[in-house]
Amino acid sequence: MNKYQAVIIGFGKAGKTLAVTLAKAGWRVALIEQSNAMYGGTCINIGCIPTKTLVHDAQQHTDFVRAIQRKNEVVNFLRNKNFHNLADMPNIDVIDGQAEFINNHSLRVHRPGGNLEIHGEKIFINTGAQAVVPPIPGITTTPGVYDSTGLLNLKELPGHLGILGGGYVGVEFASMFANFGSKVTILEAASLFLPREDRDIADNIATILRDQGVDIILNAHVERISHHENQVQVHSEHAQLAVDALLIASGRQPATASLHPENAGIAVNERGAIVVDKQLHTTADNIWAMGDVTGGLQFTYISLDDYRIVRDELLGEGRRSTDDRKNVPYSVFMTPPLSRVGMTEEQARESGADIQVVTLPVAAIPRARVMNDTRGVLKAIVDNKTQRILGASLLCVDSHEMINIVKMVMDAGLPYSILRDQIFTHPSMSESLNDLFSLVK
């Protein structure tokens, strides 16, 4: 049996970063990855990097086939770089295969050439998440039905794209494919569009999408999916929709089933997520879990912060925990992007705080005029007693950069006036934070 001080399952952000750190500290490390197409993890191969590359090229009105080619070039470069960052280190063995727990120290790795057993003093799970496929008749057997990974590898642009699910992934793909020139229809089962956002923000997003030619159908309860005359037929209670391709955007769930975590005494919840404490220990005392597999926020920067927590315990003072996280921002890379941090207005009012809500139309921002995109709105919620920012929603060009400035002020516990009176370059989108927070009375 091959013995290692650390065995890491999954080549994601936390896993690959931890592998390098431990190897540099002198540990003997094995990293197990079930697919050589996933070196580097979800973000590089089927998530952030390929989608944002396509979003960029769609905004430039690049030919779809050429955009797919460039996306592949970017992904292949980063995948190869990530592989060699680990494989070329003397203390790391990269092992291809699917890992399965035998017990809390031993793993069986299923490989085409024969199984391999590995022993790890400490084991770290970073297997990520996988697409949820709703139990709709025909969804797994009908040609032209894709998850996000499949859609990223299309050979030609669909004339009409249907999207089953109106969440953030659905919105991002809808905006992207509309920019490439597809007709897009979003089918959302709920009666409310983007329920986690304030209604004014969600309404602005819906208007922007509709102006791009995207149809949004709410209360769309799909009963079955079929194929007819080279099109996907989507059958719902009151209507039928024919599309050239259908994206299933119904969320993602932790990828744990094939691990058989129960063999190692690892508890999972009802969604298959590995149960962890504030320092990411599982219920097996020598095993940790990091990233999407824990069922928390599915962002690569959360996976990276999970790595920091584990690194601090193994090589540092052991003081870091998930409690250290304050305000976690996120961005939806539609065109223009939505970025948010902290509370919504609805959440702030429900908390009982004495608040002010201010909004600024993007059309009032000089830089937006320069960039010829005046769509959207900036919104902030301020606590009248503490003068601190409780939350912000930025729907505008470059919001994915601006939101990090707001987050830093919030995390530092500084008053909103810091942004009101800050000196920013001109003309820039960030200087609009001066104007937004000048509206606070």
Go through the PLM ranges and name each one:
Residues 1-12, 157-167:
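Beta1/beta-strand and adjacent pyrophosphate-binding region of the FAD-binding site
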Residues 2-4, 42-120, 197-220, 345-347, ...:
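N-terminal Rossmann-like dinucleotide/flavin-binding domain of flavoprotein oxidoreductases
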Residues 6, 11-77, 176-196:
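Beta1-alpha1 glycine-rich phosphate/pyrophosphate-binding loop at the start
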Residues 9-37, 42, 49, 53-54, ...:
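Flexible, glycine-rich terminal cap/loop adjacent to redox cofactors
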Residues 40, 73-79, 83, 152-153, ...:
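Rossmann-like dinucleotide-binding cores of NAD(P)H-dependent redox enzymes
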Residues 48, 127-183, 187, 216, ...:
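Glycine-rich dinucleotide-binding loop and its adjacent helix/turn
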Residues 93-96, 100-111, 118, 181-278:
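A Rossmann-like FAD-binding core segment of flavoenzymes
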Residues 141-157, 240-317:
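FAD-site-proximal beta/loop scaffold in flavoenzymes
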